[in-house]
Amino acid sequence: MQLSTTPTLEGFTITEYCGVVTGEAILGANIFRDFFASIRDVVGGRSGAYEKELRKARQIAFKELQEQAADLGANAVVGIDLDYETVGKDGSMLMVTVSGTAVKVRR
């Protein structure tokens, strides 16, 4: 399945708009893991533990998006928007949302 943040795909013609599709992932944060990550895992201003969780959440959200698009008979999703937010008490959870327009395309 073709995925794009742009409204079109170069070299393809959109033949049908199938609808808006979304994917969400909410991952809980482990307080002790996060505490130790902030102490020992920050290298050059980056935290490997947080980055791993972000990648995992993003993969889940994109998988849901693609499954919804496939259920609509689409072979591409255009206009994708990806957002990250902390939710829950004291930002204890990470939410990743992805949305776009499911379309059918041909070369």
From Swiss-Prot:
Disulphide bonds in the chain: none
Signal peptide from the UniProt entry: none
Pfam families for the chain: YbjQ_1
SUPFAM superfamilies found in the cross-reference section: YbjQ-like
Domain of life of the organism encoding this protein: Bacteria
Entry's family note: Belongs to the UPF0145 family.
Descriptive protein name: UPF0145 protein PC1_1703
Organism listed in the record: Pectobacterium carotovorum subsp. carotovorum (strain PC1)
